């Protein structure tokens, strides 16, 4: 008998084989959902809706520090995208360059 697990991932080329069934998880009957990062992160951190999910690393670190985390982090980076299109500093900081 296979273990039923809910799996939430983004719709990336690196998850597509799992989503369309070309790749199986041994011993698992996955209920796979493709969601936007915003919806995944909100539902995971607010309600722990998924057995397996992508998480915001920063939000995970904060929840871990606060003792409120419900997930165990694995070092798997699916999106491979730099999430910060811009970073702002106050003029009073004295920082002039990156």
Regions found by a protein language model. Name each.
Residues 1-3:
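Extreme N-terminus of proteins, especially the signal/transit-peptide cleavage junction
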């Amino acid at each position: 008998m296979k273990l039923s697990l809910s799996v939430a991932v983004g719709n990336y080329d690196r998850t597509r084989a799992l989503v369309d069934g070309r790749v199986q998880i041994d011993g698992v009957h996955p209920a796979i959902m493709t969601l936007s990062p915003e919806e995944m992160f909100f539902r995971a951190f607010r309600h722990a809706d998924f057995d397996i999910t992508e998480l915001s690393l920063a939000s995970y670190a904060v929840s871990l520090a606060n003792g409120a985390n419900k997930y165990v982090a694995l070092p798997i980076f699916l999106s491979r995208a730099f999430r910060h299109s811009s970073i702002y500093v106050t003029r009073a900081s004295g920082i002039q360059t990156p």
